[in-house]
Design a protein with these regions (language model features):
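Short, Gly/Pro- and small/polar-rich lid/capping loops
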Residues: 1-7
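Active-site-proximal, glycine-rich beta->alpha crossover segments in alpha/beta enzymes
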Residues: 80-113, 120
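Hydrophobic faces of well-ordered beta-strands that scaffold small-molecule active sites
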Residues: 16-18, 83-89, 110-114, 137-143, ...
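Catalytic core of soluble alpha/beta enzymes
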Residues: 120-207
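Metal- or metallocofactor-binding catalytic centers and their adjacent structured scaffolds
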Residues: 7-69
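N-terminal small/glycine-rich loop or linker at the start of catalytic domains
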Residues: 67-91, 134
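Short, charged beta->alpha transition segments
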Residues: 69-75, 94-102, 127
Length: 207
């Protein structure tokens, strides 16, 4: 993957850093976005999702450093004290997932992000994968909206929650379905994670 690193230097000398994956997020940070942010108070532009992930991340980083406060305090309440180091792979037969995870564990990774897809038997896959990885190793199941709606996603995820190594449901249904995601959040014990760009980030953290 190609990464774009963004560095913001404030008038007080504080430096904020962010990153973009140009072919995975919504593209590179443009010169126009840099011009819009340049010379502005960072807190006045850091909520502008159109700036691009790397620049927006760098602005949050700079504001947090200037206030001597962690970025989570700018977003809301603290929800975790650490983050897993994740290994990523696409949807594939469970035998291949097991091989991927064996290599991930060998290299020191602590979680496995993969694609939950309806053309595989997810319950069988998650059961066999859970048995194959150590107790500290967690699973992040990314549906990319393939759960379709709460009526389908809720019972499936509830059945999969019996496997305690499942740590995250990522985009189980369309992220724009705010009420549907609220319903899932109310009935599922495993947290739901979303990409930060849709719906608007302010909508995500408020609702």
């Amino acid at each position: 993957s190609l990464f774009e690193l963004c560095k913001v230097t404030l008038s007080n000398g504080v430096v904020g850093v962010g990153e973009t994956m140009p072919y995975y997020t919504w593209g590179e940070v443009t010169d126009e976005a840099v011009d819009r942010a340049n010379g502005k108070h960072p807190a006045s532009v850091m909520w502008d999702d159109s700036l691009g992930a790397g620049l927006q991340m760098a602005l949050f980083d700079a504001v947090g450093k200037s206030l001597d406060t962690p970025v989570w305090a700018l977003l809301g309440r603290k929800v975790r004290s650490f983050a897993h180091v994740g290994w990523w792979a696409i949807d594939m037969p469970v035998e291949d997932w097991i091989l991927e995870c064996a290599e991930a564990v060998k290299q020191g990774y602590t979680t496995f992000k993969t694609k939950a897809r309806p053309w595989f038997d997810l319950e069988d896959q998650v059961a066999r994968l859970s048995d194959a990885v150590p107790d500290h190793f967690k699973l992040d199941m990314d549906f990319n909206d393939f759960g379709l709606d709460p009526a389908i996603a809720r019972p499936l995820c509830k059945r999969l929650e019996q496997f305690k190594k499942v740590a995250i449901w990522e985009s189980p249904i369309a992220q724009e379905d705010v009420e549907g995601n609220r319903t899932l959040r109310q009935h599922l014990s495993v947290p739901i994670a979303h990409h930060i760009d849709r719906p608007a980030f302010e909508t995500q953290i408020r609702r």
